[in-house]
From Swiss-Prot:
Binding site for Zn(2+): Q262, H265, D363, H422
A GO term, aspect molecular function: NAD binding
GO terms of biological process kind: L-histidine biosynthetic process
Protein name: Histidinol dehydrogenase
Subunit text: Homodimer.
Binding, NAD(+): Y133, Q191, N214
The species this protein was found in: Yersinia pseudotuberculosis serotype I (strain IP32953)
InterPro entries noted in UniProt: Ald_DH/histidinol_DH, Histidinol_DH_CS, Histidinol_DH_monofunct, Hstdl_DH
Function: Catalyzes the sequential NAD-dependent oxidations of L-histidinol to L-histidinaldehyde and then to L-histidine.
Classification via Pfam families: Histidinol_dh
Family: Belongs to the histidinol dehydrogenase family.
Amino acid sequence: MQPTNFNTLINWQQCSEEQQKALLSRPAINASERITATVSDILDRVKAEGDSALRDFSQRFDHVQVADIRITASEIAAASARLSDDVKHAMAQAVRNIEIFHNAQKMPVVDVETQPGVRCQQITRPIASVGLYIPGGSAPLPSTVLMLGTPARIAGCQRVVLCSPPPIADEILYAAQLCGIQEVFQIGGAQAIAAMAFGSESVPKVHKIFGPGNAYVTEAKRQVSQRLDGAAIDMPAGPSEVLVIADSGATPAFIAADLLSQAEHGPDSQVILLTPDAAIAQAVAVEVEQQLALLSRADIARQALESSRLIVTNDLQQCIDISNAYGPEHLILQIRQPEEIIDQIDNAGSVFMGDWSPESAGDYASGTNHVLPTYGYTSTYSSLGLADFVKRMTVQQLTPQGLLGLASTIETLAQAEQLTAHKNAVTLRVTALNNALTAVNKE
């Protein structure tokens, strides 16, 4: 059962298992062979030719002749001066909340004695250098700068590099300044990912790359993450999505606004409404059409609605089960007492509870991070946080008594795995300790 548009109400119980599976399928995102090959060529050229290739690709893809790849401090200051105070104050408020939430994520040192004389610790260190990719296009995304730059600063990353297609919007440059980012480069697309992964005369190589992008950027991140000479990435990326669970007390206008706020991201976005109330579903369909007519990106949102769903269920529990199976990037619970069911939610990037928690709050300023796993990756990946900008190390320290107390266990396991050198590393020390003890006793 494939609906032709978002006005079609689908009764979940009347669908076969195969139809239900199809209803929860997402728009395909597999990179075409052409994109894969093009990106591979871009990576190789940037690695071999550096800035020359970056300027060539800027001319070819962005239709901009770039003389200086790096944005100067004076250019950032000028951009900041052009911004209105309202925008600056809004960004400052967002940063404050993001700081509070991400500061709370700092991990304490784990320090335990697993048995007498055996001390084990877990400590964290910041990733030394990170690269942030901020898309260009028809609308700037300064909020993504804040979402990436703030935790990078809190984590203590020594070097934070930002790349964005030319010309870079004033809002992005000011957001970078607000986050303390000094190395900003006007390059975009797969070539920007290549520059940060391999380095060039102007752009420093980084250890890990963060940020969203189009199919070419996504494919470039995938490829560099699989190369020994490349860089790690934040998470696999897919089209944006939202799933709303609504009960009979929900407000259709609120639901429609939340669905459309996701649909306007791109034609490959997907939005889903789950409700046991058919009247609510029908009212939402009407609201969507009315609000859609007023949107500046109505054409984009309408395309996204073609692969979206209005699903009527038997009850609220069935909504929860379907949502967990789908694993949405954003999950909105427009139900009474949402806190009573949050423990049943297993797979979601970020959850918005109640009528007064629009997705937009998390996208911009509540404090949570808006970089989230999509495309079903919520079953194994988490929303971006401070942990993504640090790495964990374990430390162990054994006293002589600690080693003696653990020696037979280690030797037995090493012998079972036929790893003689592992066993010898313990046996030699035990022998040395016993010899020393014997010598002391003789004295």
